[in-house]
Amino acid sequence: SGLLSLIKQGVTVAEIRRPAEPNAFFLDSPVQEQYEWAEDLLNRTHFNDTGVTVCILDTGVNSDHKLISPYMPTSCATVNSSWGTRDKYGHGTNMAGVVLYNDLKRHLITDVPFELNHTVESVKILEPNSPTEATLYGAVTQQAISLSEIYNPTAKHIYCMAITDPTSGLNNGQPSSWSAAIDQISSEGQKKLFIVSAGNVEEDELTMDGYPDACLNKSIEDPAQAWNALTVGAYSLDTDIQPCRETAGYSPLAQSGELSPYSSTSNGWKSQWPIKPEVVCDGGNVASDGKNLISGMDELSKLTLSKDINRRLFDTIWATSAATAQCSYLSAELMAVYPSMKPETVRALIVHSARWTTQMINQFGFPDTKNIGRKNLLRTCGYGVPNLEIAKDTLNNRVNMIIEGELQPYEKKGSSTKMKEMHIHTLPWPESVLQTLENTMVKVRVTLSYFIEPGPGQKGWKNKYRYPSSGLRFDIKRPNETIEQFQQRINKLMRDDNYQRGSSINNNWYLGSKNRDVGSIHSDVWEDTAINLAQSGVLAVYPVVGWWRERTTLKKYNSKLPYSLVVTIETPDENVDLYTPIMTKIASKVTVPIITSDDT
């Protein structure tokens, strides 16, 4: 009636939105009404069979759930037949609800058709009443992957695991037998995308250290330090608490857009170890009255599906589990759009699309320097919140270029093993458009993703150059630098393990090589005037030392390393057309492999 009165008075109403329903509206509804909500959503869901499936490694999934069964084509599996496949704990079914529907509440309250482009699978790897020995976690995970491939050999798999070990004692980023198993699974044979939760900050840690210090002090949990895994932390969106007697005096710890109080970080790690988490998704919030905390509050959590289908269809999920399920949904949707895309590329695009919220920058990003604020942002929030639209779509003024390549990092010559290849990518660059923009600031975002093979036998795992099989790096041609000069500079970077770049080289990179050149995915933004960038449409991908080169007795020095390179050029003016000139050049040869000379 108030809105109608405003309209009658001639007040312009820009937009009318239905108020957000609290989670309790669905959770507390009679079960028959919940079935009606589910039936309505089911009738509006259009399923496209793309062959993409997310395999959930968890406590099992209730495949009889009305909103799961149509999209779970294979039987549930388990690594231990004595456990059965039933989800007694509920966590796996909670995960499945988000993996399938992402924002379930939004789909329930609208009447808009819902497009679903992937299915789910379940391999039970955890039975709370029958714990597995920690030394077997890696073997159990490998067994689960084998089962999924046996049950569904033709599927395009994404693996989702929101199970970590808070008791491992590993809190410094070093590899473990479990994280190395994930790296091995990802890199061997048919490459695999593994999405892992960062691990959670517990209530007692928040009580002791406060927020956000508890997040800064809590290390990423094993096995989320795995180099090849896409590790997911959490940020907070919801801040509305429904008033009632139990919540009187409580308010959310985090503001909307800030790091979630649940999210662990790599803030305390030495700089040699990977950036973890790489991205953050919505993991809910924690409520506080100044003395007491409430975690898992319904209104500060994400609506999902319940295992107890006879009592209720809906439930809530929170923390890095919820975030990991969301990232799995985004990755599956991306793979469904580009079915031939390699797992390394899907990971690259998720990271490439991520952006920090303003609240994250205000929370951790000052002073705004490479050594402090930007480093802190990376080590707490990763590269930010992934955006599916940015990942999959190109606009006139923001064009994504994707290159999937493979190079041989090393070769044996005589008694020594040396660097062999680098790749120089001459991009389909819109020089003429950039020249007309003159001093307009333009951004070039570059992401390089590849999967390393972990060093066998745990030998040298404390050394970042001895754990990975090989590392790759990227660099951009500077303005006024010839191709020959650029090649010579990259050759020197390849030849000398201790070579330090001059400080002037890094000035235009937002993060800089010291921050980004760790792990097996590297992303950065180069910002410069358009006239300068017009001369910089050449990128190099080159190798650095790894155990394939150092451990010659294993005879891996002739191995090849696939990689994915994503480059985006973007102008602030939406009316600038970069897309057309790039497309006219796209048929030209993009990659020129260059073999280094004998003295390298």
Where do the PLM segments sit?
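Autoinhibitory propeptides
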Residues: S1-N43
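Subtilisin-like serine protease catalytic core
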Residues: L42-S75, S82-L136, G189-K191, Q225-A229, ...
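Substrate-binding/access-modulating region of protease and related hydrolase catalytic domains
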Residues: L126-N228, S236-T239, R311-W318, A322-T324
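Hard-cation-handling environments
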Residues: P343-E344, H352, W356, C381, ...
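Secreted peptidase-domain scaffold signal
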Residues: N371-P468, L472
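Long mid-to-C-terminal assembly/interaction modules of large eukaryotic proteins
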Residues: M441-T600
